């Protein structure tokens, strides 16, 4: 369908408006994507993509202090992107579910494709 056809299709704009998420959902999506906008948080998520680890190990992998990793993990946990589980004196962090991994994988695939 050509661009002119879309602009002239009766009801097109109204349907698109109806299909748009509500303002609260848009704000939640905006907040979610903001979390991916921080390079340290993004490194943490990518490090956890292949399995969980404790804060000390994450700190070494990501290359920032333990306190910086802990601070970012708190934000990621609040946003339901990571979860923790205690194993004795250690706390292991992992991605919450396959949706988080899928978001990361799709973004990486998009980057690899480059411009069209």
Spans of model-derived segments:
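Short, hydrophobic-biased segments on the C-terminal half of alpha helices
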Residues: 73-74
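N-terminal helix-turn-helix DNA-binding core of bacterial DNA-binding proteins
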Residues: 23-67, 91-98
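N-terminal leader segment of winged-helix/HTH proteins
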Residues: 1-36
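Short, solvent-exposed amphipathic helices
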Residues: 99-113
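Beta-hairpin "wing" of winged helix-turn-helix
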Residues: 77-87, 94
